[in-house]
Amino acid sequence: EIARLIHSSSQKPNVGIDIILFDAEDWGAPNDYTGAPINEYGGYCLGSDYWSKNLHKANYSAYFGILLDMVGDKNATFRYDSESMQVAPSIVNQVWGTAQKLGFGNYFILEDGGGIVDDHVPVIRNAKIPMIDIIDLRKNDKTFFDQHHTHGDSIEVIDKNTLKAVGQTVLQVLYEEKP
């Protein structure tokens, strides 16, 4: 939807935007796997790990990246993660601050959510692109939404208000970015 809105808008952002879709983030090695390591992330983040080591353009670089992961649950809450804060605190503050200004503070919580290995980590480490993670991670038990990795993880649990909060926040950040 973000790509469609930018494409159809008569006013374009002042900066270039690349949208990259990663696959095989949740692949992971089975608990009983005894073979050679699949990658340094336990077999997770395969798509982002591959992309970050085989960039689509020679000498590709980006000022920053925003990873959107599981951003549609009705009761989603997004806390900043430690990896994002370590490499891109100004971008985290910009995104969470923008969400607050737009009235989405009930989704974008101003507190540390701890660490998580997600697709932004290989991009940060291999491609050297500061990337933040917007991910619905429950604070107290470090789990995801109730339907995560179940048959209940379907379009019926997607909430348009959550998508609106994330989409409007990201669009506002992109349109406010100066070259």
Describe each region flagged by the PLM.
Residues 1-87:
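Acidic/histidine-rich catalytic neighborhood of metal-dependent amide-processing enzymes
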Residues 64, 71-179:
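Active-site-adjacent substrate-binding region
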